[in-house]
Regions:
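N-terminal/domain-start alpha-helical segments
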Residues: 1-100
Length: 100
């Protein structure tokens, strides 16, 4: 079963998203902090990552930049911020998609 890592500090988002993905035979793991997410990704075994933009420690843009230095895992930015420039920045930093 493909594994997806969600890095989002909203602990209410993970369970319903996990239930949704499970219908498509995808396993979701949530990290609430970027440092936790990077540690999990370093262990390997994930097929894709979903990043929030507004995170503690570092924002999702910096997290994407950091992740791209060591991994080519598909990255989707998922955020409530719908500004066009945010989308441009996310994609320029290496995100594969940006969903406002």
């Amino acid at each position: 079963m493909p594994r997806i890592l969600l890095i989002d500090d909203d602990d209410q988002l993970g369970p319903p998203l996990a239930a949704y993905f499970q219908r498509f035979e995808l396993a979701l793991t949530q990290a609430l902090r970027p440092s936790e997410g990077l540690a999990l990704l370093a262990q390997g075994g994930f097929d894709a990552a979903i990043l929030d933009v507004m995170l503690p420690e570092m924002d999702g843009f910096e997290l994407c930049r950091t992740l791209r230095k060591t991994s080519d895992i598909p990255v989707v930015m998922l955020t409530a911020r719908g500004d066009v420039m945010d989308r441009v920045v996310g994609l320029e930093l290496g995100a594969d998609d940006y969903l406002p």
